[in-house]
Amino acid sequence: MDISRPRGTRDFLFAEMRNRKEVEGVLRRTFETYGYHEIKTPIFEELKLFTVKSGEEVVNQIYHFTDKGGRELALRPELTAPVARLYMNEMQKKPKPIKMYYFGSCFRYERPQAGRFRQFWQFGCELIGGRSPLAEAEVISLASESLHELGLDGFEVHIGHLGILRGILGREEIPSELQDRIMGVIDKGDVEELEALLGEVEVSGESRELLMKLIGTQGGPEVLDDVEEYLGGYSESLEALEEFRELVETLHYFGVDDYHVNLGIARGLDYYTGIVFEIYVPELGAQKQICGGGTYNLVETFGGERVESTGFAFGFDRLMNALGMDEENMRMVDVFVIPIQDSTVPEAIRITQELRAAGVSADLEVSGRKLRKALSHADNLGARFAVLTGEREIQDGKVTVKDMERNSQETLPRDEMVDKIKGRC
């Protein structure tokens, strides 16, 4: 029988899991310093949760099924909608803003390729009830600081505002559903398809030219002066531009000054309403985007109160690629304990348990191998020390400790052994 891993999924072995847990730990600590607390949602939800405002491309990629009770369910393709559902079910009466973060796997039926998988992980946060330039700036600051804490260099923060683009479409009286479709094409970056769609929905020549000019606008905060000149009498877009200026000013107080204004960011999810941002690592090429987020109002879309929120998520797998952490030379255990004779197994067990109780990673030779093979196994594990328990040493109240890195050994008093090893690990 040929049993293999499903296409588009991965197995993670010891070294890679160690690295992923290390990065996860840094992100958890950083998010918690900003006052966020962790939540968990189910891996599957009702299908309709994702078909209302997730965007055409995401909807087409959903893994969905009908359960034995006739319910239409789906494996989650992203985590913002489940968080909004959790808020509606459990937290509407709690004081706001509410800060929560999450880490979990998502599923999309995508064509597997470099950097894209059908099961992938997101690490993100949501600030529920927090739409303001101050809230948005703090969220962007958290994303940037998290990457600095991980020691990642060369990343770029790109910030846009959907209100500027939607203000133009609103003046053209384009329905929101068609606006969502246009935003999806802008997000794909397909200029020819965008021009064709704008012509199809009869956007005026003036607005069409303005949209094309805006989505190509990138640079420092100074380009917002040019944008103001472009917008002229588009009042809703000018209001959004003023919000953008307030965000720029507030980011400075958070120490976030290195970013790009990029009005071509539209995001692939239809629920974003205001500020949007993405973080790129250019050296990753086509898969350079490692983070995306912005301001949205999903709760009202789902039938709840109007509560604007801001959040983002790291594509955890791409983040790991960007960090390029070494997977070799992993130490699987600090100490490997080897009983020399069968009669010394009880003492070897006691030593192993004492080391573990002291917080030292310890493993025990349980296969009955000869000393030479047991030491070879300790070396393969990357053990720092091997502890040898022989009958004579036990009678004398001592143990032999072999330094695997220096290829030397010494005899230590039994009652001092744990403290001395702990001090060297």
UniProtKB/Swiss-Prot annotation:
Catalytic reactions of this protein: tRNA(His) + L-histidine + ATP = L-histidyl-tRNA(His) + AMP + diphosphate + H(+)
Molecular function in Gene Ontology: ATP binding; histidine-tRNA ligase activity
Record's subcellular location: Cytoplasm
Keyword Signal: no
InterPro entries hit by this protein: aa-tRNA-synth_II, aa-tRNA-synth_II/BPL/LPL, Anticodon-bd, Anticodon-bd_dom_sf, His-tRNA-ligase, HisRS-like_core, HisRS/HisZ, HisRS_anticodon
Keyword vocabulary terms for this entry: Aminoacyl-tRNA synthetase, ATP-binding, Cytoplasm, Ligase, Nucleotide-binding, Protein biosynthesis
SUPFAM superfamilies in the cross-refs: Class II aaRS ABD-related (SSF52954), Class II aaRS and biotin synthetases (SSF55681)
Assigned protein family: Belongs to the class-II aminoacyl-tRNA synthetase family.
This protein's name: Histidine--tRNA ligase
Classification lineage: Archaea, Methanobacteriati, Methanobacteriota, Methanomada group, Methanobacteria
